[in-house]
């Protein structure tokens, strides 16, 4: 699955050229033209409104200058790229969470029940405070991972894993609470709340989900 694949002209493909399955050395990255012989794609929409491609490679050949970096050392480059990608989507996610927080607070100020705004109910105030706390924790972790990007690979990887765990957990919590506090309209097509929740759900799966990065953080 290649997110954004329908708009790509070239693909970066990882392939093992030597060694055993679990060896770090022996993996290389290649630039492959999407129109090359042996490359086939099937485009489809994703749940968050984006597009992706299913890519199949069959007997594809590339020239020697298609390799990125030194032969057999592509895993380090790939891992660095993933960590930078995590930092970027963490920043995107906190923007979505802020929007959901703001929209929920505004809705609870205007929606009335029993003659008063539902935002005056203490139990709902507590839930909105919890949403805000999850957002603030995510902001802090996003700052942290961006500050660690230029450090050594181990520090960068641990920061990226920690941030991805926080973003995944907080994004799900904030999205669920926003939908519930908006009531039945929370998942309607006309309201953007449900669309932001879908995007946060997709972000959790990109570059590895919470479970994957918990294990990565523990091993760092």
Specify the residue positions occupied by each region the protein language model found.
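Glycine-rich phosphate/pyrophosphate-binding beta-alpha loops
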Residues: 1-4, 47, 187
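A short core secondary-structure module
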Residues: 1-41
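A generic structural signal for well-ordered coil/turn residues at beta-strand boundaries
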Residues: 6-9, 23-26, 35, 50-56, ...
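Structured core elements
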Residues: 11-14, 31, 40, 54-56, ...
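Residue-level signal for inorganic ion chemistry
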Residues: 30, 55-57, 97, 138
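Flexible, small-/acidic-enriched active-site or ligand-binding loops
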Residues: 33-63
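A short, charged helix-loop
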Residues: 53-81
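Alpha-helical interface subdomain recognition
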Residues: 77-220
């Amino acid at each position: 699955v290649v997110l954004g694949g329908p708009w790509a002209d070239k693909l970066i493909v990882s392939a093992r050229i030597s060694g055993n399955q679990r060896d770090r050395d022996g993996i290389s990255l290649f630039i492959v033209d999407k129109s090359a012989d042996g490359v086939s794609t099937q485009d489809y929409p994703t749940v968050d409104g984006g597009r992706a491609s299913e890519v199949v490679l069959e007997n594809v050949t590339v020239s020697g200058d298609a390799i990125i970096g030194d032969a057999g050392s592509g895993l380090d480059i790939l891992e660095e790229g993933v960590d930078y990608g995590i930092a970027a989507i963490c920043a995107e996610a906190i923007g979505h969470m802020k929007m959901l927080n703001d929209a929920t607070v505004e809705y609870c100020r205007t929606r009335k029940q029993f003659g008063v705004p539902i935002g005056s109910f203490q139990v709902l105030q507590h839930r909105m405070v919890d949403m805000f706390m999850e957002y603030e924790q995510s902001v802090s972790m996003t700052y942290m991972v961006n500050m660690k990007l230029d450090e050594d690979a181990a520090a960068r990887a641990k920061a990226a894993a920690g941030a991805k765990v926080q973003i995944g957990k907080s994004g799900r919590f904030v999205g669920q609470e926003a939908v519930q506090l908006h009531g039945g309209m929370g998942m309607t097509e006309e309201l953007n709340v449900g669309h932001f929740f879908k995007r946060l759900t997709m972000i959790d799966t990109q570059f590895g989900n919470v479970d994957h990065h918990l294990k990565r953080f523990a091993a760092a």
